[in-house]
């Protein structure tokens, strides 16, 4: 289903999407097209994109073609989903140490829709961090890796 969503293949394209997406949540899915978990997430993203079209713009970003952002957002697990609103990086408290991105696939379409609604409403009120509406048991668990520690 990843063929249904627009792809960003360079740093310049990602920069342009961040700068030009106004009054909507910008969803950037970092991953690889052939990865099974990425395909599962892409299916959820593509099925919800029309329902969320007034609140969100969804793009796929290949981690191998945008190494600058992969390093900047510390994308060590794929898929990782990063959110922006009017050029501002939106953070979400998932109950984990990392609030900068969602790692893994969403369990259901409704989890993704609820998260976008919460980010959108919070951003419209000027918040840069919001509380995740997703049930903690539906959030994938992972260990943070730090270099040289």
UniProtKB/Swiss-Prot annotation:
Entry's localization field: Nucleus
Predominant cellular place of this UniProt entry's protein: nucleus
Residue ranges that the Swiss-Prot or TrEMBL entry lists as coiled coil: none
Record keywords, A-Z: Cell cycle, mRNA processing, mRNA splicing, Nucleus
A GO biological process held by the record: mRNA splicing, via spliceosome
CDD domains in the record: DLP
Domain of life: Eukaryota
Family: Belongs to the DIM1 family.
Subunit structure: Homodimer. Interacts with the U5-102 kDa protein subunit of the spliceosome.
The protein's name: Thioredoxin-like protein 4B
Protein's organism: Homo sapiens
């Amino acid at each position: 289903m990843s063929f249904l969503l627009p792809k960003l293949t360079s740093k310049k394209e990602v920069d342009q999407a961040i700068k030009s997406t106004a009054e909507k949540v910008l969803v950037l899915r970092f991953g690889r097209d052939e990865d099974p978990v990425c395909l599962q997430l892409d299916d959820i993203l593509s099925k919800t994109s029309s329902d969320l079209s007034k609140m969100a713009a969804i793009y796929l970003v290949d981690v191998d073609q945008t190494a600058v952002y992969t390093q900047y957002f510390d994308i060590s697990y794929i898929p990782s989903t990063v959110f922006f609103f009017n050029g501002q990086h939106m953070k979400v408290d998932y109950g984990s140490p990392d609030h900068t991105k969602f790692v893994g696939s969403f369990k259901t379409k409704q989890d993704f829709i609820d998260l976008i609604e919460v980010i959108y409403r919070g951003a419209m009120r000027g918040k840069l961090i919001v509380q995740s509406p997703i049930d903690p048991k539906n959030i994938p668990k992972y260990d943070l890796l730090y270099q040289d520690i």
